Swiss-Prot record:
This is GTP cyclohydrolase FolE2. InterPro entries: GTP_cyclohydrolase_FolE2 (IPR022838), GTP_cyclohydrolase_FolE2/MptA (IPR003801). Pathway: Cofactor biosynthesis; 7,8-dihydroneopterin triphosphate biosynthesis; 7,8-dihydroneopterin triphosphate from GTP: step 1/1. It comes from Bordetella pertussis (strain Tohama I / ATCC BAA-589 / NCTC 13251). It is an enzyme of class 3 (hydrolase). The keyword Disulfide bond does not apply. The keyword Membrane does not apply. GO terms for biological process: tetrahydrofolate biosynthetic process. It holds the Pfam family GCHY-1. It catalyses: GTP + H2O = 7,8-dihydroneopterin 3'-triphosphate + formate + H(+). Belongs to the GTP cyclohydrolase IV family.
Length: 265
């Protein structure tokens, strides 16, 4: 049985004591935290999801420990607030004085869903995308990075050119990491990637839709090299995007390995 706490007794705060080893810690905090998150979707609605969170701060050499419970308290504060890139950045900025830190990072990884209409029949279904938001705060300055993994179809130009009929095609993952401004929307980045693939994906297709996607991919063949270059060209031309990295992996249907390419800009 727990003994009662005497309010007259001051409990020791060990983590606030001085550390004598004089070794600063670049990142300390919590990771692997599954916590609800509301994301402001492209249609303006608040989409509920569950994110995997990592929150860390830098710890000066003279401090023994950080305030671990305050990370979770910060998550709880924003649990019911629809999150935007700008608000996510503000959350990272708020974390620093709360933890008495000069710099810190917040990362949230979560599934995001878009309701899509099939290209011919118009039947609607959800498609999921793996997203990651990263905010890096130094004082009042915050850098926001958006990471999106977009599944698409790719069709091989060489296979089409040498075959009398048909061409091998496969599902591909295009992962874009980009420094974006606070007004940037996830849907815009996803749409940009899908536009540059041989064809986009849908959760539900009828026979007329299957005919469309088969012929669409055949008319728009792309190597993995074409895919990353075309996406990179679009990112370079976008005024709301800074540094970026485009990674494409084609899960080859005629090999037991993937084709892979990366462009950084």
């Amino acid at each position: 049985m727990n003994s009662p706490i005497d309010p007259a007794i001051v409990m020791p705060d060990v983590q606030s004591s001085t550390d004598t080893r004089h070794i600063p810690i670049q990142r300390v905090g919590i990771r692997g935290v599954r916590h609800p998150m509301l994301v402001l979707a492209g249609d303006g609605a608040a989409q509920p999801t569950v994110a995997n969170w990592t929150l860390t701060v830098a710890l000066p050499a003279e401090e023994k420990g950080t305030h671990m419970s305050r990370f979770v308290a910060l998550l709880e504060k924003y649990r019911a607030t629809p999150m935007t890139p700008a608000l996510f950045a503000a959350m990272a900025r708020e974390m620093l004085p709360l933890l008495h830190a000069e710099r810190g990072d917040i990362t949230a990884s979560f599934p995001y869903f878009i309701n899509k209409s099939a290209p011919v029949s118009g039947v609607q279904s959800l498609l999921d995308y793996e997203m990651q938001w990263i905010a890096r705060a130094v004082g009042e300055q915050v850098e926001f990075e958006l990471v999106a993994q977009v599944p698409v179809t790719s069709l091989c130009p060489c296979s089409k050119a040498i075959s009398e009929y048909g061409a091998h095609n496969q599902r591909s993952h295009v992962t874009v990491s980009a420094i974006v401004d606070g007004d940037f929307r996830m849907d815009e980045l996803i749409r940009l990637v899908e536009d540059e693939a041989s064809c986009e994906l849908w959760g539900l297709l009828k026979r007329p839709d299957e005919k469309y996607v088969t012929e669409r991919a055949y008319d728009n063949p792309k190597f993995v090299e074409d895919l990353v270059r075309d996406v990179a060209a679009r990112l370079k031309a976008h005024p709301g995007i800074g540094r970026f990295r485009v990674e494409a992996e084609n899960f080859e249907s005629i090999h037991n390995h993937s084709a892979y390419a990366v462009v950084e800009g």
